[in-house]
């Protein structure tokens, strides 16, 4: 039996070897560029068709964002043509192609008659899967109509947003969020809160880059999320108006306008919104005596309303100073006022769970926020394709103020009433200078170099009356100068990209009220490397490495920033150091006619990783110890995971997108502190956690052209050194219908259909407290949105049809 099996295997091997060694038809490389006649603007997703004279077989490819195409065809006689929706075809006469050839620049002219008579219904896919990144196109996602950028990110593959608005990529909260490829003042001082205020309608797409090249900011151990703001691209005057209303009480409107000619492009966006986001939380805690016996129980019940009213405006102009020089200027404003009443009841019980009293704490808070940013960009294009120089400038200012009056009393005892006032004023200034140079070398080489200077100053003034012990003024200064260079090339089926980034950091953390001054100066080299191999046009694999940094900011550093609870207080740590991460990613991409599949295995090793610890403060409220939560540096964190994404279109009327991520996280470290009794308390944070996350999105076109979209997510349980989070499932629904001859649409979306989206935690501090908590930032929401489009319908340049496989054709590995 074994001999027969051996003979069969050898025979099969010889047959396969002989088949693999058969002579293949000669392949040649065809390249070139497609532009719009008259404006010289590149045409993205134009199709280059090669039709074999004898067999009539079709082959070819599409252009990238720069209008450039490059693909292989079998040598032979062809008729060649360039096609682009609403443009006249360009035909190239019959010719024999036997060697590599550059077709040069192909100019295409708009077909005016066709534009008048045709409504183009093809559209961008919601999610595009590429080997090195995922692109989420906001425009076609019904779930985020009338929502915020936080809602947008919560629909992006690989990204999760927890109940408090914290953004994580593959479960890693060490994420750098960019706007239009740069750090931006629009993200505000508290980025989680800012993302809840920015309207989704202002965003065109979101790019998720898990292992960025040296060109990008080195910050973000988990990767980079780049939010690309909307800017009209179609010729003439175009725009859209959107109005929405929902329950809980929510309403708003936004207007997008742009006017484009050969010499300039004016773009603008204005939005107004009023939102009420009621939420709630609970904590059930059991406190212990020093000998481990139960001391008491406390039930904490919290309700809050987060009412915000604000506007945002963005105005800009692209000036085509010449065919090779463009100057862009943009000015953005954002203002918001908030009312955030927070009402907490503490129900006290003795060790036998007999009621002993009830305390009420009302935090009546109002807030105001204003952000302004001016940005300018110069782009110089040289004669050779992709040879260019860009210079970016940005200046931003942010102000965030919070004023609160806190009323605290024992129910039934008016004399116990205590009143506190808190004022929290924040100011931020950020200046940015960035320049990037790209030089193509030879047939497939690419050299890049650049500089980025980021200069930031934050001032936080926190005042508590009448208890001045909790008051503090914190000054944070961050100056980072960065230089990078990288080079990439391609030969046969291999391509590579090697880069090195150097960052010199000067950080000051000064607690002015406490006379505590900290200055930290450090510099780091951040290497990056990517190797890619293409098995075929539809299958490729890549291996990448990068070094990343995560700098603590804001509440991580401020010793005092909130008193919303008087027994559970968050306290920043001004001595915390940045963490450094080595990231390795192995990815595979496969495309079929109806399916795109991307999978990756990744490893992140982080030194000085951030970890939140809880400890006794030495203070008591009615005999209850006040617990402090504070961040520290642990020695190491190991994170290894596996992820896959897929787009599947089984039918023209049904599209599926799925994302699954699982990872194992191991932390190693010990922490010791001296408690209020003078005892040295040692805590071991060695912990191994395993968890997973999945999201499935289904979009179905029903009869009468009604679109139905369903999003279902599940976050599995996860343990940590002092407890665990429990699993949570949630679902969103949306329906949309185009009306008025496709010039308008109306949509209905329901967020958190089962009202189940919460953060559920179990915490254990030995001989101190065991607790169970639930936190729901926003209850179920229902929203109706009406959108009207004028002079653009669905035939804008930025809505050209993409392949069903959502492939990233033309992407050079490592290229941003």
Where are these regions (language model features)?
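Short, acidic, small-residue-rich periplasmic hinge/interaction motif at the N-terminus
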Residues: 35, 49-51, 83-87, 100-142, ...
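Short, acidic Ser/Thr/Gly-rich low-complexity loop/linker segments typical of extracellular
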Residues: 52-68
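Short acidic/polar hinge/loop motifs at secondary-structure boundaries
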Residues: 72, 149, 155, 182-210
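Surface-exposed extracellular loop regions of Gram-negative outer-membrane beta-barrel proteins
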Residues: 223, 227-241, 299, 310-316, 506-508, 537-583, 603-625, 629, ...
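Outer membrane beta-barrel strand-and-loop segments of large Gram-negative receptors
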Residues: 430-434, 468-483, 573, 577, ...
């Amino acid at each position: 039996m074994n001999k027969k099996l051996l003979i069969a295997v050898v025979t099969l091997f010889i047959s396969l070897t002989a088949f693999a060694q058969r002579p293949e038809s000669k392949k040649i490389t065809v390249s070139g560029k497609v532009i719009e006649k008259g404006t010289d603007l590149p045409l993205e997703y134009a199709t280059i068709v090669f039709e074999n004279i004898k067999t009539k077989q079709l082959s070819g490819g599409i252009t990238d964002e720069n209008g450039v195409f490059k693909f292989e065809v079998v040598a032979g006689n062809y008729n060649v043509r360039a096609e682009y929706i609403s443009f006249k075809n360009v035909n190239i006469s019959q010719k024999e192609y036997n060697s590599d050839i550059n077709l040069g620049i192909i100019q295409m002219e708009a077909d005016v008659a066709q534009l008048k008579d045709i409504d183009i219904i093809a559209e961008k896919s919601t999610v595009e899967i590429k080997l090195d990144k995922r692109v989420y196109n906001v425009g076609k996602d019904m779930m985020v109509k009338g929502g915020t950028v936080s809602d947008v990110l919560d629909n992006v593959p690989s990204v999760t947003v927890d109940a408090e608005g914290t953004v994580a990529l593959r479960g890693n909260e060490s994420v750098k969020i960019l706007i239009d490829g740069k750090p931006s003042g629009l993200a505000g001082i508290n980025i989680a809160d800012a993302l809840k205020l920015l309207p989704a309608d202002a965003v065109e797409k979101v790019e998720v880059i898990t292992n960025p090249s040296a060109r990008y900011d080195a910050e973000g151990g988990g990767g980079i999320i780049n939010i690309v703001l909307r800017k009209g691209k179609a010729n003439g005057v175009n725009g859209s108006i959107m109005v929405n209303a929902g329950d809980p009480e929510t309403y708003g409107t936004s207007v997008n306008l742009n006017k484009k000619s050969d010499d300039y492009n004016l773009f603008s966006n204005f939005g107004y919104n009023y939102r009420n986001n009621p939420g709630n939380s609970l904590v059930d805690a059991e406190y212990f005596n020093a000998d481990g016996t139960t001391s008491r129980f406390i039930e904490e019940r919290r309700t809050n309303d987060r009412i915000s009213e604000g506007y945002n405006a963005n105005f800009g102009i692209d000036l085509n100073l010449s065919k090779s020089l463009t100057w862009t200027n943009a000015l953005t404003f954002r203002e918001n006022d908030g009312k955030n009443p927070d009402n907490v009841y503490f129900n006290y019980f003795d060790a036998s769970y007999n009621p002993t009293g009830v305390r009420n704490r009302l935090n009546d808070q109002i807030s105001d926020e204003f952000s302004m940013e001016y940005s300018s960009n110069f782009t110089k294009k040289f004669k050779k394709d992709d040879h260019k120089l860009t210079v970016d400038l940005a200046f931003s200012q942010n102000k965030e103020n919070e004023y609160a009056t806190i009323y605290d009393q024992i129910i039934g005892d008016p004399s116990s009433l205590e009143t506190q006032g808190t004022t929290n004023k924040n100011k931020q200034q950020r200046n940015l200078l960035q320049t990037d140079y790209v030089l193509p070398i030879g047939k497939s080489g690419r050299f890049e170099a650049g500089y980025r200077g980021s200069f930031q100053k934050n001032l936080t003034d926190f005042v508590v009356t009448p208890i001045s012990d909790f008051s503090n003024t914190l000054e944070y200064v961050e100056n980072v100068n960065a230089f990078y260079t990288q080079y990439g090339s391609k030969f046969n089926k291999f391509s590579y990209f090697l880069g090195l980034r150097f960052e010199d950091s000067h950080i000051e953390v000064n607690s002015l009220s406490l006379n505590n001054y900290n200055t930290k100066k450090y510099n780091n080299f951040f290497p990056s490397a990517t190797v890619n191999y293409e098995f075929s046009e539809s299958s490729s694999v890549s291996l990448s490495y990068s070094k990343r940094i995560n700098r603590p900011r804001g509440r991580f550093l401020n010793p005092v920033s909130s008193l919303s609870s008087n027994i559970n207080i968050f306290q920043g740590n001004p001595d915390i150091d940045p963490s450094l991460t080595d990231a390795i990613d192995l990815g595979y991409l496969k495309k079929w006619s109806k399916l795109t599949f991307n999978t990756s295995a990744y490893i992140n090793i982080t030194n000085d990783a951030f970890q939140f610890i809880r400890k006794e403060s030495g203070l008591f409220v009615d005999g209850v110890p006040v617990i402090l939560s504070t961040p520290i540096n642990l020695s190491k964190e190991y994170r290894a995971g596996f992820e896959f994404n897929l787009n599947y279109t089984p039918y023209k009327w049904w599209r599926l997108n799925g994302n699954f991520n699982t990872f194992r996280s191991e932390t190693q470290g010990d922490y010791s502190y001296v408690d209020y009794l003078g005892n040295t308390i040692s805590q071991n944070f060695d912990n191994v956690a395993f968890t997973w996350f999945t999201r499935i999105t289904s979009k179905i076109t029903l009869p009468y052209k009604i679109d139905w979209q369903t999003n279902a997510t599940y976050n599995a349980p996860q343990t940590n050194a002092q407890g665990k989070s429990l699993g949570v499932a949630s679902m969103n629904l949306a329906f949309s219908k185009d009306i008025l001859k496709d010039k308008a649409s109306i949509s209905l979306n329901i967020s958190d259909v089962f009202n189940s989206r919460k953060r559920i935690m179990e915490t254990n501090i030995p001989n101190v407290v065991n607790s169970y908590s639930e936190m729901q930032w926003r209850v179920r929401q229902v929203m109706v949105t009406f959108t009207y489009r004028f002079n653009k319908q669905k035939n804008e340049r930025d809505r050209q049809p993409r392949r069903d496989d959502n492939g990233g054709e033309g992407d050079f590995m490592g290229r941003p």
